[in-house]
Amino acid sequence: MSNTTTTATTTNINENKVREIYKAPMKIGEIEYIPYQGESQIQDLMSLIEKELPEPYSIFTYRFFLNQWPELCFLAYCNGQLIGVIISKKQTHKLLERGYIGMIVVDKTFRRQKIGSTLIKLTIEKMIEMKCDEVVLETIFTNIQAISLYENLGFTRIKRLFRYYTMGADAVRLLLPLNDKFLIK
């Protein structure tokens, strides 16, 4: 096999991998959902998260998630304006592959339009492709709307975390099993 053929094959494999990770944008009504594309989007997503979430995150936290698991970040745009984002990761936890949703935000003016649930569903689909056994997230214990959203998507409350957030608020941890590894046989 010549070097030219080897290079072409390697290039095709790499291009296919990129296409698999970064699927084409999906549009529902006026809302366009796109995978994270790179560093040029960090400032906008940081601004949205800082505006909507009470918990402060450093640039290092964003880069930790986005550089290692870019395929687990999705953004929602309306007419070119970033209005929603979800940032997640995958890790091994007690012999299971765990998907972890670290941050999810929808601009207040765009809530109650199923944008958050669409971002979560996109992420869960990707986590299933990545062979995750479960999905876990935390939210402020008093955030009834968010808890209701997660429970409507199949998540179950599993733990209360006292004084979990830096501002002293309690959190609730929720879990969504993705396969039957949780069943006692």
Swiss-Prot record:
GO terms for cellular component: NatC complex. This is N-alpha-acetyltransferase 30. It comes from Dictyostelium discoideum (Social amoeba). Belongs to the acetyltransferase family. MAK3 subfamily. It comes from the Eukaryota. The keyword Cytoplasm does not apply. InterPro entries: Acyl_CoA_acyltransferase, GNAT_dom, NAA30-like. GO terms for molecular function: protein-N-terminal amino-acid acetyltransferase activity.
